[in-house]
Swiss-Prot record:
Protein name: Probable autolysin LytO
CDD domains with a match to the protein in the record: PGRP
Pfam families: Amidase_2, CHAP, SH3_5
Region (Disordered): 155-177
Top-level enzyme category: hydrolase
Amino acid sequence: MQAKLTKNEFIEWLKTSEGKQFNVDLWYGFQCFDYANAGWKVLFGLLLKGLGAKDIPFANNFDGLATVYQNTPDFLAQPGDMVVFGSNYGAGYGHVAWVIEATLDYIIVYEQNWLGGGWTDGIEQPGWGWEKVTRRQHAYDFPMWFIRPNFKSETAPRSVQSPTQAPKKETAKPQPKAVELKIIKDVVKGYDLPKRGSNPKGIVIHNDAGSKGATAEAYRNGLVNAPLSRLEAGIAHSYVSGNTVWQALDESQVGWHTANQIGNKYYYGIEVCQSMGADNATFLKNEQATFQECARLLKKWGLPANRNTIRLHNEFTSTSCPHRSSVLHTGFDPVTRGLLPEDKRLQLKDYFIKQIRAYMDGKIPVATVSNESSASSNTVKPVASAWKRNKYGTYYMEESARFTNGNQPITVRKVGPFLSCPVGYQFQPGGYCDYTEVMLQDGHVWVGYTWEGQRYYLPIRTWNGSAPPNQILGDLWGEIS
């Protein structure tokens, strides 16, 4: 059952009640319980049960009418909440009031009989006292309960493109397809590298340190007839750019791509081309084609994609390779900062593995970059009218509304809308924030808000990675008002 009033309408009623007196049951003057009942009657036409105020959360069935929250250190009350104080108030009967404002440190309420002046004449029925509904500030306490009515819905002015709107249903439309790779097998002729005698144990992904012109075709032209002296400087099994894969060595051959006997003999080497000269968009496409080729080969060999089968050049020797991928996906530049730390190495490997597994499952993954990297251009790009896109690949739009969390905690992030960003705090069930920005990033819809001078980023539903306005969204994790 929905309330007869919207939240804003009820808050206006609370404001008009200040200075008045309420004796709903016509007993013992103007009790705090009477004021709670007056508000409940305005909302639902019903009266609350309970011998004292402290009994309200337990003596009533709030199913469909309201949600009851027990106070926690991180709970944030909302205007319109009924707050119930425990038996350490009101001579054991508790106390009840209506919240009009709240922070994490205190609540401001309208209440009746806080000072005990609601019944002073000694006459039981109806009774009289001098105390009236008063606005007052209180600290949170334990135990304390907050009862949030199911208010009549209000229409919030939001863009039709906003991801806080109802989920866009996926309709029958062409699904994205993987790029059709053009695989050119043209084995080098200047030297017949030895055979391994078995399938590779996995794949080593390299960055070629090549210029913008160092495409797969360019490597083919330069190496396919190169002499042994040139091949000894290094030759991988495949070179990838755009949708082109040049296979320079047979799968059965060893390569000279890791400067390490184990890496050369047992692992198939793939170079992601143009890693020094291409723009980020081009290089990321080259990476995706590489992941697609890795998926094809692993399936062919009957191997899974994991940390044993997907390797990095820097696991075999001290090198900055794969330098460009490291910067884009971990934010760490091994060229300027030294060898890639182990945690960053695992972060990069796991990203590669996740992308490759998606291709192995017939899916089309979305390339993501670290919020610490300067991916794409340094300018904000307009996208799909209401949306813009920043240098980190984040789609964003201005929107002012209130998000109220549902029944599960949500991890809030600082710095930016990425799951890899530092944790701010746990956004508790029933908590709310007044946000000013909506973003699409890292598989989620995020809202941005400022609290006590700190900017926070809160994911509120999933996002399938499609660019707006064609995004497909999961269920909202709370309510927007």
